[in-house]
Amino acid sequence: MKRVLALIFMMVLAVSFSSCADSSQDVEVVPRLNEDVQTDEASLMPDTEKETEEQSMTEHYTTNTKIEDVINDPVFGDYGRLIFPVDSGYYGGSTLGNLSLTWYNYIDSDKTVEICNYMRNQAENGDTIFYDIYTEEEKAADPAKKDTGLFFFKGNPGTKFAIVNAGGGFAYVGAMHDSFPHALELSKMGYNAFALIYRPGAQTACEDLSRAIAFISRHTDELQVD
């Protein structure tokens, strides 16, 4: 009986030592894997993100900037009015810091400021950040089409693109909270992103999205998107 117990005890010790040896090997491997992952992530970082880290963005706007000052900033031309809801009845507040949007909560004022500064810097540097999707003739025939277009958040040249559509209950377009932030983050990842400003309404919204897709498809070379 004593021999049997001794044999069992020795077997348990052997298994324990084996487990410890395996665990120590795993601990040694993990740091190497982490090092490899970090190296790969650095090499795959989009060019636009590297440039963003290297170059600080000029802060033209702050949380105290009046919304109307952004809308009427000459650098945006006529499309400044489309940065915020066309129908002012769907947003409140007088500054970027206290902007509110109907049916939305938790609006990040810092993100609002970041987006407005990004747009201004891009436009000031000569980059096109807004594209009409309808011709002047089409807009003259249907004035509602004047309140449409694509805001472009540029990623790496030749990369895939996405169209981001904000909600608003088909009553208005809540882009500042519901599509601009997403488009900006996609561009930081290297993707080309478009935020569509469409005519509220289930049918007209779909028509504008269809037109936006057609517009991008016809101008892939000019836009440098895939």
Model-flagged regions — what are they?
Residues G168, I197-G201:
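Short beta-to-alpha linker loops that shape the active-site pocket of alpha/beta-hydrolase fold enzymes
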Residues M176-F194:
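Short amphipathic alpha-helix adjacent to the substrate-entry channel of hydrolases
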Residues D142-K154, K160-F161:
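A short loop-to-beta-strand scaffold at the N-terminal edge of the catalytic core in hydrolase folds
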Residues C20-K146:
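N-terminal targeting or regulatory segments adjacent to alpha/beta-hydrolase or S9 domains
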Residues F215-D226:
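Gly/Ser-rich "nucleophile elbow"/oxyanion-hole loop immediately N-terminal to the catalytic nucleophile
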Residues G169-A171, A193, F215:
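Serine-hydrolase catalytic-loop signature spanning alpha/beta hydrolases and amidase-signature enzymes
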Residues R3-D22:
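Sec-dependent N-terminal signal peptides of Gram-positive bacterial secreted proteins and lipoproteins
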Residues T159-G168:
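Short beta-strand element of the alpha/beta-hydrolase
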